[in-house]
Every structure is written in structure tokens, then in C-alpha cells.
Regions:
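Exposed, low-structure sequence patches enriched in small/polar residues
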Residues: 1-8, 12-357
Length: 357
């Protein structure tokens, strides 16, 4: 159920205040919003969230209720400010904990400089203090090793980003990310236990700083009717065996575009190539429905090549896609996670018919 009522609306020559009240009944969220337009756009809101995380566990023979739950009621004060100058755009966002159970806070800022010929430079800073997920705090299961009731501190993330757009040359993104008190799932092996009970997946919190550097390059090149759209991501973590990331990720599209039959048909066909370097990809635990860090099996260094045909005839669009068609001749050693093979060759097609243009 969703209710939206305009409570107050004042129109002044230099000051405009809009007050809204939002009520999300089903998930217990209440929002009170004020918009102020003076020397920029200012948004102030009051947010109340009530959550209940419950794990039901009953023992029928003994009529025992072992259910566990987490109840959270939190109030936040949110604010945002934006201002546009002739060549500069400024935007600030903040979410501040006032009182309650979930003590999360965030702040983000963006300054963007616009130059000639659609060139721009953007500087960003983000801060997040986020409570761990409920699944890391509380879990109940018939499996002995999958029961816990934890108290973790907030994970604190600071990131600095630079985005440079040089029209017709390249797009450059540089991100430096620092995470403190990071919480994740890990695989714990017990050599003294036999069979499938010799390991468990448990949540762990690291107190040290984890740092990641990411550099992303994007470039689009056009030679007549031929085009190349390339993206390259280079990333390095200073905390190996804690956060596992591929050092190289590449996505490339090579395609040919043309009009045919006196421009009655627009045709586009080409290849899409995806690749990432070998790394210890996170494993998947079906009991928790969570990914966990593993350092036993490396996955990567296999290309995924797709062949596609797109066509447009007046109001109708057609597409044919042969996904991962190289699977049969590049070796069956591709996985989306340890013990979870990536999909083989797949054919897809579709039709879009617009009745009204």
C-alpha cells in the first residue's frame, strides 16, 4: 500500500518550500520530505524504518519453539543539496542516524567541471558506515556448524573517484576504495571431522583496512561502417586472500552497421568478447544463499564470445544472438563459481513490434 499526500505548498518569489508525506504501510517505512529552492536545491527528509528478521525453527516432537528474530526500528535524517553554475555542477547527499537500532550513516559529494566539446572532469567522495547484513548476524539451521548469533561493528567505506571524459578519445575512471571492519563469509575447514561435515561457512569481520585500486578505460572507435567499443578494467587489492578480484577485466564489441534496401532495413552484426584474468572467485553456498571467499581454486582466463545480428525494419526490431558459441572449441573449463559451470552455447532471438511510433 502506498499513500502520498501533499501537506504544505508555499510559493514565494525567492523561496519555494514543498512538504510531502509518504507512507509505505507494508514494509513500515514513513518518510517526511521538505524541498527548499533557494541558492540551489535543498532536500530534507525524515525516514523511519521498522524491520523484522525472523528465523523459524520448531521441534515438533518436543513442542519447542527455537525461533530467533531481530527487530530493528531506526530513524534517519536525510539531506541533499545541488547547485549548477555555468561550468560546474555540485551535488551533496547525506543520511544521518538519529536514534534506533541500525546506526548507519552515509555521505557523498560530486563536483563536475564541464568543458568544451562535451569534455568533463568529475571528482567524487563517498563515505558509508553500514551495519552488517542480518544473515551475518543471526542464522539458525539443523546443521550444527551453521548456527550463530554475532555482534559485529559497522563496516566503514571511504572512496575517492575521478572520472575524466575526453570526447572521441577515451573515458577514464580511477577509484581508490578503503574498507574497515569488512564482514564476509569464509570457508572454515575442520580436519578432525569426516565427510561433508569437515567444513562450514561462517561470517568473519576484519579489523584492518582493506584497500582496492580500480582503473577503468573506455574507448569507442569508428571506421566508416565498422565500430569498436572497448572497456578495460584494471584492479588491484592490497589485501590478498581477503578480497579476491580479477586484475584484468575486458569487454569488447566489434560490429558492422549499415542501411540496406534504400534505408528500409537497418542492419547491425558483430562479435562481443568478454575476458577476465584468473583469480580465486568467490564460492557459492546454497544453504545460506551467500557467496564466500575461497582460496583453493582459481577461475578465469577463458574468453566468452557472442555473435549477434540486430535488424530494424520500420517499426519492427529483430535480434539473434549466439551466446558463448566458442565453448566447444576453447575447452570446457569455464565456471561462474567453483563447482558451478558457466552456461554452454545458447541461442536467443527476439522480436519487438511497436504499434505506435
Amino acid at each position: 500500500m502506498f499513500v502520498k499526500d501533499v501537506v504544505i505548498q508555499l510559493n514565494l518569489s525567492v523561496l519555494i518550500i514543498l512538504v510531502y508525506f509518504y507512507c509505505f504501510v507494508n514494509n513500515s517505512r514513513f518518510i517526511f520530505v521538505i524541498y527548499i529552492y533557494k541558492f540551489g536545491k535543498f532536500n530534507l527528509s525524515l525516514l523511519y524504518i521498522s524491520d523484522r528478521y525472523s528465523l523459524e525453527n520448531y521441534q515438533i516432537d518436543d513442542f519447542v519453539d527455537n525461533s530467533q528474530n531481530i527487530n530493528s526500528k531506526t530513524t534517519y535524517l536525510n539531506g541533499s543539496y545541488s547547485k549548477e553554475f555555468p561550468k560546474i555542477k555540485l551535488k551533496l547527499n547525506t543520511e544521518n542516524f538519529i536514534f534506533g537500532d541500525n546506526q548507519s550513516n552515509s555521505f557523498s559529494s560530486i563536483v563536475k567541471f564541464n568543458f568544451k566539446n562535451d569534455n568533463s572532469l568529475a571528482l567524487k567522495y563517498n563515505f558509508y558506515s553500514v551495519a552488517p547484513s542480518y544473515n551475518t548476524l543471526l542464522h539458525s539451521s539443523n546443521y550444527e556448524n551453521y548456527n550463530w548469533d554475532n555482534e559485529f561493528d559497522n563496516s566503514v567505506t571511504n572512496s575517492i573517484s575521478l572520472n575524466l571524459i575526453l570526447s572521441n578519445i577515451l573515458d577514464l575512471d580511477i577509484d581508490l576504495i578503503s574498507v574497515k571492519k569488512h564482514v564476509q563469509f569464509e570457508k572454515l575447514i575442520d580436519d578432525n571431522s569426516p565427510g561433508i561435515n569437515n567444513y562450514s561457512i561462517i561470517p568473519v569481520q576484519y579489523l584492518d583496512n582493506l584497500e582496492v585500486l580500480k582503473i577503468k578505460l573506455a574507448r569507442k572507435i569508428k571506421f566508416g561502417k565498422f565500430s569498436i567499443d572497448s572497456k578495460l578494467l584494471l584492479q588491484k587489492t592490497m589485501s590478498d586472500n581477503i578480497i579476491n578480484l580479477p586484475e584484468i577485466v575486458s569487454r569488447n564489441t566489434f560490429y558492422y552497421s549499415t542501411d540496406m534496401f534504400k534505408k528500409a532495413l537497418y542492419l547491425q552484426t558483430g562479435l562481443g568478447v568478454k575476458y577476465f584474468s584468473k583469480f580465486y572467485m568467490n564460492g557459492y553456498d546454497p544453504l545460506l544463499s551467500e557467496l564466500y571467499v575461497q582460496n583453493e581454486k582459481e577461475i578465469g582466463e577463458f574468453p566468452i564470445i557472442d555473435f549477434f545480428i540486430n535488424a530494424k525494419i520500420q517499426q519492427t526490431r529483430l535480434y539473434f544472438k549466439f551466446e558463448h558459441f566458442n565453448s566447444s572449441f576453447t575447452g570446457y573449463s569455464y565456471y561462474s563459481a567453483p563447482n558451478y559451470p558457466y552456461r554452454d552455447f545458447t541461442f536467443r532471438f527476439g522480436l519487438v513490434w511497436n504499434f505506435f511510433m
